């Protein structure tokens, strides 16, 4: 969400202020696979165009001491919410409205399974403005399309694909497709929803984030804080006020000691060849048997197995089918699966923003209640997203 400042207002002092305060340097973690540590590349959280510059909304409000975009006449849209909010979602919406009416921004800092997508659809219907949902995963984008179709009467357009309407109320837009929308059209957008916002706090994400000048912005993510501290990008755009909830659903975590310790193969740089270590680990027969034993011993549960390897996911699924255990996999280019006792997939494919109902045409409504993490997770935010798959 941006405020457009024309060239005539760009004094030398303002330019200096922008460069000083909106140039961010990501915090680097230690990477033993590199010979030397390169200096981190800075990220400029502003976008220059021929006639001016696009600046983060909240940063502009604070530094220029006024409410950005208040003078824009946004076209109204007629949208009716046909779904139904749960009791806890109604309470969340009360807080959301207060924050939006106060600052024009809110962050839904809610655990996976809270229903951030349907809340976004409700907000769009409530405020009745041309809406853009910005995301960076095609699987997530398609879930938004389905949510709007199932819970509103809105005309929805996936940017870059064929449209059924010349005048859509809602646009679902991938980060890299924002450039397909004419500037004149983007300036009419009154509500911007940023889904899985933590994934857009990058150099490549900034042009998309600042590509719109809406009246309201809704940031949605369960894990905004990033290890490189680039969540400051989102703070400069939407501020730090949020609607937050803790996970209240009880759950157990069991650490399984496999006794497996693969030999470490050293790379040319003198450090462990991590790719080979991972492969040797999942190829270990003892470890494989332990995972399959856990699944067999919990036949009364619906199990999700997450791995970092497409090859391993397919291998485990095939092994389960040989034991007459109903199973399917979702990884690589595979776009759907059949409802089964076990689903095996990769963290990259279904670890974030995954909703079974949108990927499984035979889904019977029984959620996963057992998660087997069959790989290592480096980032805490990634772990939270993965674990969140069984809180739906």
Give each language-model segment a name.
Residues 142, 156-166, 304, 311-358:
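Conserved helicase ATPase core of P-loop NTP-dependent helicases/translocases
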Residues 102-124:
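Walker A/P-loop
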Residues 161-191, 202-207, 357:
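Conserved helix/coil segment N-terminal to the catalytic DExD/H
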Residues 68-107:
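Conserved pre-motif I regulatory segment
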Residues 179-182, 223, 331-392:
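Conserved RecA-like P-loop NTPase helicase motor core
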Residues 117-119, 126-150, 308-313:
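Conserved Walker A/P-loop ATP-binding site and its immediately adjacent core
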Residues 124, 269-308, 315-319:
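Conserved interdomain hinge at the start of the Helicase C-terminal
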Residues 190-191, 198-254:
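Post-DEXD/H (motif II) to motif III coupling segment of the RecA-like Helicase ATP-binding lobe
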